[in-house]
């Protein structure tokens, strides 16, 4: 049981022995033999479908990784902290490679749903969640942003500051994604990989940490 839980990333809230005891103490099912067999066959059929789907996903992932390096902008996105090959490819695919398509970094942030919508009428101003956007782009850039805070002190600080202002986790991740978009935009326009030493805010945090140590 312990090995099974570890393999599937169980949070560890309850010990394996307690979970096993609960499973064994569960009341018996009330279904008849015929229904039990039918349900078993249905579950096994779904397992077969899932196995085939997972195999296809792995094949596609291998293909993405194999061809990502052929794109001239690949190094920009793979140089980002904890972007990974697959996530970097997702962000690159949604971001695109047409420089004239975007006026500035804010245009990219709007497309990716990383910036809110502000509505003004007279003295009234309302800020709301941006529903109209490229949702695949938002998922890709927010996945990267969430991962990046575990490798970049600057990203971790932007996220922590957003939480301190009262934002919940999804909102804080979008705030971080918007900040990253401005950084990536500069790299993308200059056609140069990300370098923390050239990223002013990130470099300053690194220097402060080094001085404190």
Residues covered by each model-derived region:
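A detector of single, family-specific signature residues
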Residues: 1-213
